[in-house]
UniProtKB/Swiss-Prot annotation:
Listed Pfam families: Ribosomal_L33 (PF00471)
Cross-referenced NCBIfam families: PRK00504.1, PRK00595.1, rpmG_bact
UniProt signal peptide: none
GO MF annotation list: structural constituent of ribosome
Family: Belongs to the bacterial ribosomal protein bL33 family.
Protein name: Large ribosomal subunit protein bL33c
Subcellular compartments: Plastid, Chloroplast
Name of the coding gene: rpl33
Length: 65
């Protein structure tokens, strides 16, 4: 039987460079969606992903929806 709460959450990761840098090549912010396990990862997720606006690998942090 399934439990009441879903353990996996769909989260959004946002580039930290794009959100802080006003002088960038393109307008916009790089965002990725992924899922995380609520029980195993209680704190905010940080992953190093490729940002097409910055053209480099940067740290993407979990944001609130």
């Amino acid at each position: 039987m399934a439990k009441g709460k879903d353990v996996r959450l769909v989260i959004t990761l946002e580039c930290t460079n794009c959100s802080q840098n006003p002088n960038k090549r393109f307008s916009g912010i790089s965002r990725y969606t992924t899922s995380k396990n609520r029980r195993n990862t209680t704190n905010r997720l940080e992953l190093k992903k490729f940002c097409p606006q910055c053209s480099v690998h940067t740290i993407h942090k979990e944001i609130k929806k």
